[in-house]
Amino acid sequence: MLKRDMNIADYDAELFAAIQEETARQEEHIELIASENYTSPRVMEAQGSQLTNKYAEGYPGKRYYGGCEFVDKAEQLAIDRACQLFGAEYANVQPHSGSQANNAVYMALLNPGDTVLGMSLAHGGHLTHGSPVNFSGKLYNIIPYGIDETGQIDYEEMEALALEHKPKMIIGGFSAYSQVVDWKRMREIADKVGAYFFVDMAHVAGLIAAGVYPNPVPHAHVVTTTTHKTLAGPRGGLILSNDGEALYKKLNSAVFPGGQGGPLMHVIAAKAVAFKEAMEPEFKVYQACVVENAKAMVGEFLERGYKIVSGSTENHLFLVDLIDKGITGKEADAALGAANITVNKNSVPNDPRSPFVTSGIRIGTPSITRRGFTVEDTKQLAGWICDVLDNTDKPEVIEATKAKVLEICKRLPVYA
């Protein structure tokens, strides 16, 4: 018999210490990694529920195991809420991650060796959009498109490449692009060559749910997303479509049994919670503030003489190009980390350095906005970051900045 008062602290001191240390790090560091966010205690409650005990291969009403009548309810709630949130007719909430969701789309729509047009990783795309080190780059013939000299997606190049190579699928979406994507234009390009149009909206799903960024669902054959990042739910994936039953069946089969076995029912329940939270009025206010804060930070960086890729942001993230400053992304990452400010080094367009060093950093505002940073707080933070980047060789500047960070983190805790 299992006792309900069993806990990690009494049983596994080493693991408990690691968890406590990470909890403290999150509270005492300013999180600016664009793909990270803080999920609610309600989401974590669902993830820690007894639904983790249940195997449920298949889909609601069509399971391979008995005893699934209650997890069916949980999964159907997640499906219905996802459809309502994004204006979709179909949703699959079972992918364990965004990459798994993307893999399912490839499996459903393509054969190995088919040609795919995807955004270059060096210009802001994602590993699963055709990187040579990823399954997508190994199994398919990838033709990369990129951005122009202004930092905007080069739609003319994209169309020319599509007409030349006749891809079977065109991918829209990004991991490091700060502007608004013209989903309609991309669909028109896909239609010209008879290609599927697939959108990976993982980075901006929360903004889209709140109506502060254009929704690709009306334009794409299929859309995927993660359920964390700006959506602020549990780590997982989601597939959406409005393109008809024939495609829905292919997508379902590509997830199970094509790529996964049993779904994670506790995570699916947490997704249902997150989708409900994303329908609340305060979520819309939050997402609008995410964009306002990102714009405010960009303004401060520009005033301090820093180069921003594309010169502005229209979403939750932006890239700081450090080539002219004579410091690497790796050095900037380390210096800011010493001041309790967490960013990630990131390649910039035409970066002369390797992906392990880079010439830029990527900054995102979902996490700081979640903990209550205002525009004024965010401007102040941008100034602190510039102070550190201007003085990476001066420990006293880094220590002074760290003291300011600890003070504001105490004033604005993640979990009050």
Curated annotation (Swiss-Prot):
InterPro entries: PyrdxlP-dep_Trfase (IPR015424), PyrdxlP-dep_Trfase_major (IPR015421), PyrdxlP-dep_Trfase_small (IPR015422), Ser_HO-MeTrfase (IPR001085), Ser_HO-MeTrfase-like (IPR049943), Ser_HO-MeTrfase_PLP_BS (IPR019798), SHMT-like_dom (IPR039429). The record marks H228 as: Plays an important role in substrate specificity. Its main location: cytoplasm. (6S)-5,6,7,8-tetrahydrofolate binds at L121, G125, H126, L127, E245, S354, P355, F356. It comes from the Bacteria. It is found in: Cytoplasm. Its EC number is 2.1.2.1. One of its GO terms (molecular function) is pyridoxal phosphate binding. It catalyses: (6R)-5,10-methylene-5,6,7,8-tetrahydrofolate + glycine + H2O = (6S)-5,6,7,8-tetrahydrofolate + L-serine. Its cofactor is pyridoxal 5'-phosphate. Pathway: One-carbon metabolism; tetrahydrofolate interconversion; Amino-acid biosynthesis; glycine biosynthesis; glycine from L-serine: step 1/1. The keyword Amino-acid biosynthesis applies. GO terms for cellular component: cytosol. It is an enzyme of class 2 (transferase). The modification N6-(pyridoxal phosphate)lysine is found at K229. It holds the Pfam family SHMT. GO terms for biological process: glycine biosynthetic process from serine; tetrahydrofolate interconversion. Keywords: Amino-acid biosynthesis, Cytoplasm, One-carbon metabolism, Pyridoxal phosphate, Transferase. Belongs to the SHMT family. Homodimer. This is Serine hydroxymethyltransferase 1. It comes from Photobacterium profundum (strain SS9).
